[in-house]
């Protein structure tokens, strides 16, 4: 049997739209970054609600075990917030003598935690003072969060 060379198969060479890998990589990268930031914000929101719950528990129980947990949650929140790239504010201000000083929001949160510990040790302080201090700490955390 002889093969006919005149018969050729015609393949339609359609132009298949080629998607560049850089476009795919860029869109994948942005979607991953968006999901990652969304997960981090969800985690920070959960930590903030845990801090609020422990703050209420701390005002009722006034024991050092709950205080240690509260401080641990606050420090974990601050660490997560700073590590995930949320801004920690530093502002420059001047005191009465004209000296400049830099105040950090994270440092201020730490100072409020120390004040809360001191107020917990003073058993004669009413619970309203503890609520005020816990409210200040929560406000600073929200300021760091937004």
From Swiss-Prot:
It comes from the Bacteria. Pfam families: DUF327 (PF03885). This is Uncharacterized protein YaaR. The lineage of its organism: Bacteria, Bacillati, Bacillota, Bacilli, Bacillales. The gene is yaaR.
